[in-house]
């Protein structure tokens, strides 16, 4: 999965997919009452990027639905996965359940079209804080109460805080999550990736590949250089988040990687651990 980073304006959906992304990451900011409000990152953000592009969340969802609904004039067949980077650090811990509930209602109405031929992309809810695990509970229970528990088949999870992997496992246990787990690891592109290294990403890959691991997929962020792309591929990650999808696509075309990796399509289940 080539994951376009910080896609917060509607026009950027086309821009990133046309550069080679089959997945996008979108920031979601919340108001004081835990309503998802804007697709907005704000300052500071990655180097060489404009941090302040935004849309109203529901307007973005409608555009995303068009981009991922077969037969729509805006449809992109290859856009198959969307990561919502949920900026819940602005909320109190006790608001996490409400944030999940309100997020589910927004997605149900504006993305899934109340279960009636809505967008088809798989969705990852990426949460920055382990203590906000109740967001998952609120999301799940709301879809069930609204009569659409089947939509959870399209939803996965990520805790994005670079926490100790054992602690991440405990948070999932509390949330009752037993699958659909993506694990992110990384650092802003403003800091050279070698300073962080790939140790934790490799630890996540080892968990993914072990018989008793809880992780299904691992992605590394934010990668804009060819050398770092190669290192991440050598570590056998499933996804790379990038500001430059064309760079990742180029490296995947190199002879060393062409035979080993391919770009994921809609038929590749993002919740299944890939067996070599």
Curated annotation (Swiss-Prot):
**Pfam families hit by this protein:** GDPD_2
Q: How would you classify this enzyme at the top EC level?
A: lyase
Family named by the database record: Belongs to the arthropod phospholipase D family. Class II subfamily.
GO CC terms in record: extracellular region
Q: In which tissues is it expressed?
A: Expressed by the venom gland.
SUPFAM superfamilies, per this entry? PLC-like phosphodiesterases
Tell me which residues bind Mg(2+).
Answer: 25, 27, 85
Protein's recorded name? Dermonecrotic toxin LsaSicTox-alphaIB2i
Q: What biological processes does GO assign it?
A: killing of cells of another organism; lipid catabolic process
Q: Where in the cell is it found?
A: Secreted
Task: Name one molecular function that GO assigns to this entry.
Answer: phosphoric diester hydrolase activity
Enzymatic reactions: an N-(acyl)-sphingosylphosphocholine = an N-(acyl)-sphingosyl-1,3-cyclic phosphate + choline; an N-(acyl)-sphingosylphosphoethanolamine = an N-(acyl)-sphingosyl-1,3-cyclic phosphate + ethanolamine; a 1-acyl-sn-glycero-3-phosphocholine = a 1-acyl-sn-glycero-2,3-cyclic phosphate + choline; a 1-acyl-sn-glycero-3-phosphoethanolamine = a 1-acyl-sn-glycero-2,3-cyclic phosphate + ethanolamine
Cofactor binding note: Binds 1 Mg(2+) ion per subunit.
Q: Where is the active site?
A: 5, 41
* Species this protein is from: Loxosceles sabina
Its keywords, alphabetically, are: Cytolysis, Dermonecrotic toxin, Disulfide bond, Glycoprotein, Hemolysis, Lipid degradation, Lipid metabolism, Lyase, Magnesium, Metal-binding, Secreted, Toxin
Disulfide-linked positions: 45-51, 47-190
Q: Which InterPro entries match?
A: PLC-like_Pdiesterase_TIM-brl
In the UniProt record, which residues carry a glycan? 129, 253
Name the coenzymes or cofactors required. Answer: Mg(2+)
Q: Tell whether Magnesium is among the UniProt keywords.
A: yes
EC assignment: the record states 4.6.1.-
Functional note:
Dermonecrotic toxins cleave the phosphodiester linkage between the phosphate and headgroup of certain phospholipids (sphingolipid and lysolipid substrates), forming an alcohol (often choline) and a cyclic phosphate. This toxin acts on sphingomyelin (SM). It may also act on ceramide phosphoethanolamine (CPE), lysophosphatidylcholine (LPC) and lysophosphatidylethanolamine (LPE), but not on lysophosphatidylserine (LPS), and lysophosphatidylglycerol (LPG). It acts by transphosphatidylation, releasing exclusively cyclic phosphate products as second products.
Superkingdom is Eukaryota
């Amino acid at each position: 999965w080539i994951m376009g980073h910080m896609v917060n304006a509607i026009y950027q959906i086309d821009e990133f997919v046309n550069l080679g992304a089959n997945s996008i990451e979108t920031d979601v900011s919340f108001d004081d009452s835990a309503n998802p409000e804007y697709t907005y990152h704000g300052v500071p953000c990655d180097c060489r990027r404009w941090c302040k592009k935004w849309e109203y969340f529901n307007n973005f969802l409608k555009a995303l639905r068009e981009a991922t609904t077969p037969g729509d004039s805006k449809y992109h067949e290859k856009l198959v996965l969307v990561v919502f980077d949920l900026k819940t650090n602005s909320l109190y811990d006790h608001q996490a359940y409400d944030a999940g509930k309100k997020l589910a209602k927004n997605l149900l109405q504006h993305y899934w079209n109340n279960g009636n031929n809505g967008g088809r992309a798989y969705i990852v809810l990426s949460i920055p804080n382990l203590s906000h695990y109740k967001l998952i509970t609120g999301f799940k229970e709301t879809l069930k109460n609204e009569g659409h528990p089947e939509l959870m088949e399209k939803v996965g999870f990520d805790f994005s805080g670079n926490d100790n992997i054992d602690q991440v496992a405990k948070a999932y246990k509390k949330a009752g999550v037993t699958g659909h787990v993506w694990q992110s690891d990384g650092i802003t592109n403003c800091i050279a990736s070698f300073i962080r290294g790939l140790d934790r990403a490799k630890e996540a890959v080892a968990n993914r590949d072990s018989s008793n691991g809880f992780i299904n997929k691992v992605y590394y962020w934010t990668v804009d250089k060819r050398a770092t792309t190669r290192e991440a591929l050598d570590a056998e990650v499933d996804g790379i988040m990038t500001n430059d999808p064309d760079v990742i696509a180029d490296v995947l075309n190199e002879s060393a990687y062409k035979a080993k990796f391919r770009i994921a399509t809609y038929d590749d289940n993002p919740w299944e651990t890939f067996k070599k």
